[in-house]
Amino acid sequence: MNESAGTRHYLDWASTAVPEKFLPIDEAKGGNPYGIREGFPFGNPSSSHTEGQAAKDALESARSRCARVLAVEPEKLYFTSGGTESNALVLHSCLLRKERHKLLYSAVEHPSIVENCMVLESLGLPVSPINVEKDGRVNAETLSRALEKHPDARFAAIMGVNNETGSLMDISSLISAARLSQAKSGLPVHFHCDLVQALGKVPVNIGDMDSASFSAHKLGGMRGIGLLYLKKKLKGLYSGGSQEGGVRPGTENTLGALSLAGILERRAMPETVRQENEKARERFKYLIGELRKIKRCALIPGDREDDDPRFSPWIVQVRFREVPGPVMVRALDKEGVAVSTGSACSSNSPERPVLQAMGVDGKARLEGIRVSQGWSTDTADLDALLDGIKKALSFL
């Protein structure tokens, strides 16, 4: 049983992780509704007085701690409100370039990439999707061909792990393809990677990227805080202050930054990631093996193996023939199991563009549900899911 979720079984970690306790927050004491420890540096980090400088010191300490975990320089990290804003800041900075070049993005990107690209296109910036294979991944050869086809492209956005299917991109080979294209043309190609579903789950090498986005709440940290890594500083789209080097103006979220630093140290250290990744693989190897025994069940994609290196072991997409995904989600919820149909950012949309890009037919797309696990997931959670599915299929 997932103790953090009480008597229910939470298997929607890709949407948000079960919160963990971390340093600056404690259980509420003395009527303090926020549970902030006495002495917390509450001042505005931009203020010159003692309280402000204490907050500034705490903010920069949090930045340095994050940098140590990610193995990058602190000055290349910028605190934001989360993955969506981090992605938007990078994309919209392209509007401020002297020459407006084309942007490429994988056809399975998170809505915060795809929808912002649509906005940029409406503003006159050319964009083009990169096709994916049936497993939802972008091949290095495909990226190379896309860059050859679009010689005016100077930007490529390809996520680390897909948030709906768990497809695991070979980022190293993709970056190599972008750099080779750059060497041939003599023109730079900015490589951006949405690492929201990768951080803390699979090994990542951020230093090779030009930019990357992260979110705390996917790791069990606070909502409303994220990170943007920039190898080279970009011009911010909006103004209103010099905070975060002008990349992200506005009074900084010191409490959130400390939360993010704490959760990165707890969940994203390389050895911790390796150990937890192995545990996750064993759990989902069991789950996928049991799902295969259910007659009306099919994995998406259909050739996903029980322990498949093409996929993150934290997310699996599965469908049940003749049962719409939302119907199965509601049926499982009544059985005490929380899953989803896909991205929480598009939960009100019946369309499944990620599955469509993978070549999944319309009916099968609508039958898909996403199961995603976390660090406290155990066999009892998976068995509850399997029992709930069997019960639902008995009357659906």
What residue spans do the PLM features occupy?
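Pyridoxal 5′-phosphate
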Residues: M1-L396
